[in-house]
């Protein structure tokens, strides 16, 4: 941030030290959340009041954030993990929200986290019930959901504009012979959560029986990494895409290729020999597929074509006993 330009005030006459307040709130949220969820010893570094162009020229509160170094292996083990990215992004958002609300003397409310424990079940010949559980945010008590939005997709179409519901379940008519899919978002006065996984159901004509599809693939993660055993731990380390590429959230556009330089002592020499961490560049223009959380519809279409009706649920709904497997016939 920078406080001296334009005689120390913004265009509306407010003090440029508001940039310091914005910086402090964002940094405080990031450090607190990382220490709580990942690394209790995470270092909180200083704030700089310096004349960087990006901080000096804007006539609104501004801050520059440098969190991780791409040349630091320990940093990048966090930096390419989609779960860590979400935590930090949400912390930045919370800091901005707290700053804006403080300017207008308003209580802030953080948008909820996505719901989980989702399940679909047949409750009649052509009716289904979708249920789920709210996820409370242990880092932010204001993020509790108040309502939910259920989005519906018929066949291969797109999702509709959603139906607002007040409770943790939703009943609807299920047309025969077509796959219907559902996702849920949580809602409060702070906004709308990220969407849930997508569940699907289908009612077959002259159904031979009912099949339960358990959506077990809910993983997102960074790729496999290693540090050589001591005393070679200072010599070799890196990421092993061939062992485990990791799973992006939805998709990834930052991946350029697998790592090829694992020697920690090798310095940067030029862009074609960039030292420890050097990667191939054969994926620079590619979009890498991630977890879409939209798989029951794929299996359900085949099940429906075979003459069986189907419903689906999340794996945590089975683990918690919300869905009882004995309700379904084993063949």
Give names to the regions the model predicted.
Residues 98-143, 176, 190-209:
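Pro/Thr/Ser/Gly-rich low-complexity, intrinsically disordered linker/stalk tracts
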Residues 171-193:
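Beta-strand-rich modules
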Residues 160-167:
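Short beta-strand segments within Ig-like beta-sandwich modules, predominantly Fibronectin type-III
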Residues 147-151:
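Beta-strand signatures of extracellular beta-sandwich domains
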Residues 38-105:
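Active-site-adjacent mobile loop/cap segments within catalytic or ligand-binding domains
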Residues 1-15:
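A short, glycine/acidic-enriched catalytic loop
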Residues 197-329:
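Aromatic-Pro/Gly-enriched surface loop or interdomain linker
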């Amino acid at each position: 941030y920078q406080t001296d330009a334009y005689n120390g005030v913004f265009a509306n006459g407010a003090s440029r030290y508001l940039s310091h307040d914005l910086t402090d709130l964002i940094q405080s949220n990031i450090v607190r959340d990382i220490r709580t969820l990942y690394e209790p010893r995470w270092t909180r570094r200083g704030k700089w009041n310096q004349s960087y162009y990006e901080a000096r020229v804007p006539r609104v509160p501004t801050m520059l954030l440098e969190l991780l170094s791409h040349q630091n292996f320990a940093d990048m083990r966090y930096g390419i993990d989609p779960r860590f990215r979400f935590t930090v992004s949400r912390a930045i958002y919370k800091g901005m929200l707290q700053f804006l609300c403080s300017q207008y003397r308003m209580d802030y409310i953080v948008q909820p986290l996505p719901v989980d424990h989702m399940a679909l079940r047949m409750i009649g010949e052509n009716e289904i019930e979708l249920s789920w559980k709210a996820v409370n945010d242990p880092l932010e008590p204001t993020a509790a959901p108040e309502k939910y939005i259920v989005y519906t997709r018929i066949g291969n179409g797109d999702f509709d504009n959603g139906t607002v519901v007040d409770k943790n379940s939703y009943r609807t008519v299920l047309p025969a012979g077509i796959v219907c899919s559902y996702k849920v978002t949580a809602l409060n006065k702070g906004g709308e959560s990220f969407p849930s996984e997508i569940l699907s159901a289908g009612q077959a004509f002259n159904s031979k029986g009912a099949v339960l599809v358990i959506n077990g693939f809910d993983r997102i993660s960074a790729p496999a990494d290693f540090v050589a055993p001591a005393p070679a731990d200072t010599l070799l380390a890196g990421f092993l895409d061939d062992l485990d590429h990791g799973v992006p959230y939805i998709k990834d556009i930052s991946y350029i290729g697998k790592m090829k330089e694992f020697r920690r002592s090798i310095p940067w020499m030029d862009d074609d020999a960039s030292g420890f961490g050097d990667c191939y560049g054969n994926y620079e223009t590619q979009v890498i597929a991630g977890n879409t959380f939209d798989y029951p519809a794929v299996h359900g279409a085949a099940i429906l074509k075979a003459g069986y009706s189907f419903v689906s649920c999340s794996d945590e709904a089975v683990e918690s006993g919300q869905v009882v497997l004995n309700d379904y016939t084993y063949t």
